[in-house]
């Protein structure tokens, strides 16, 4: 039991000499409760982080259009109108922890409009810096600055992978991977910048483009090399440098592994109640895809991909669940 307590406190670095003295004073009779409360006072050892604002950065995976449409599958209500609260984006799932809503999706006129996305369609890693600059300067129209109380959500990199892949074979794979690693370094630097500004950060690795329907098609179309495997290697190069470059401290940064998530979902779709993890579900271009514009017999809750490179509702839901776990489980 004592070993278990030591693991909790020393692992998170939250209690010093005074904390251990308090444990000793409590005595063996209450050792089992030390993990949760201090002896006699009922005060938690760790203050639970309560975000006062959620800020999302990155690409279209985190975009809500002005009318609440998503680059995924948009749900419809009984009147065939878009229900922007249903089939939530991962950033909406995280904001819901705090009862926050985004201004683009507030059909109930909630007063808790404290979640904002600066993400943009087509954004690459170098544009993440501009998004953060915009927020710091107050140019986003949502209240400037970034600081304590802000929870920043970051997901970018897929468009970088696709852009780099498009340069093959004009550029060698080695050159492309070097470029991808440099972009991973830049991504890590921007995550650390958010921490230095005072925010807590949940950053997701880029989705593995090598397991997408796009990758399946590319592999079938070219015989020079396994194009799907190449897309995975480019993704891994970017993600790998991001992972080693971000601040390795769970008090400030929570990491979501979206690349491993989609890899697992593709390998074992039944484990996630999926009936299809390799094909495209939408018959129209995003963000105009709705539950009424899907291929016959398909449902967004059981198909992984909305289009060739973007997650359907099933993928967004899983990603949101993982990010929510980080928001609630990390010692922010």
Q: How should these model regions be labeled?
A:
Residues 17-30:
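Sec-dependent N-terminal signal peptides
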Residues 2, 39-332:
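Conserved active-site regions of diverse hydrolases
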Residues 12-13, 32, 296-298:
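Intrinsically disordered, low-complexity regions enriched in Ser/Pro/Gly/Gln/His and often acidic
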Residues 1-18:
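N-terminal secretory signal peptides that target proteins for export/translocation
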């Amino acid at each position: 039991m004592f070993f278990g307590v030591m693991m909790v406190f020393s692992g998170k670095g939250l209690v010093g000499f005074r904390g251990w003295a308090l444990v000793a004073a409590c005595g063996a009779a209450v050792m089992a409760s030390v993990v949760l409360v201090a002896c006699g006072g009922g005060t938690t050892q760790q203050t639970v982080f309560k975000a006062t604002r959620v800020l999302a950065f990155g690409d279209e995976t985190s975009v809500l259009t002005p009318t609440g449409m998503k680059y995924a599958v948009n749900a419809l209500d009984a009147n065939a109108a878009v229900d922007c609260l249903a089939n939530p984006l991962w950033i909406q799932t995280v904001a819901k922890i705090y009862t926050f809503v985004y201004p683009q999706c507030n059909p109930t006129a909630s007063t808790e409009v404290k979640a904002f996305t600066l993400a943009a369609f087509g954004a690459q890693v170098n544009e993440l810096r501009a998004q953060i600059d915009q927020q710091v300067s107050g140019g986003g129209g949502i209240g400037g600055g970034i600081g304590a109380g802000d929870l920043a959500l970051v997901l970018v990199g897929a468009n970088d992978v696709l852009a780099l892949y498009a340069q093959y074979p004009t550029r060698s794979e080695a050159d492309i991977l070097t470029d991808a690693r440099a972009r991973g370094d830049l991504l890590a630097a921007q995550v650390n910048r958010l921490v230095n500004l005072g925010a807590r950060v949940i950053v997701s690795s880029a989705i593995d483009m090598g397991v997408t329907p796009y990758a399946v098609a590319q592999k079938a179309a070219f015989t020079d090399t396994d194009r799907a495997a190449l897309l995975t290697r480019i993704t891994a190069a970017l993600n790998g440098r991001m992972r080693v470059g971000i601040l390795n401290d769970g008090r400030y940064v929570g990491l979501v592994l979206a690349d491993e998530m989609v890899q697992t979902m593709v390998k074992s779709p039944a484990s996630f109640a999926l009936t299809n993890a390799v094909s495209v579900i939408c018959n129209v271009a995003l963000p105009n895809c709705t539950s009424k514009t899907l291929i016959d017999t398909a449902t967004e809750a059981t198909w992984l991909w909305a289009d060739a490179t973007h997650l359907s509702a099933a993928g967004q839901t899983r990603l949101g669940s993982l990010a929510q776990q980080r928001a609630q489980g990390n010692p922010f």
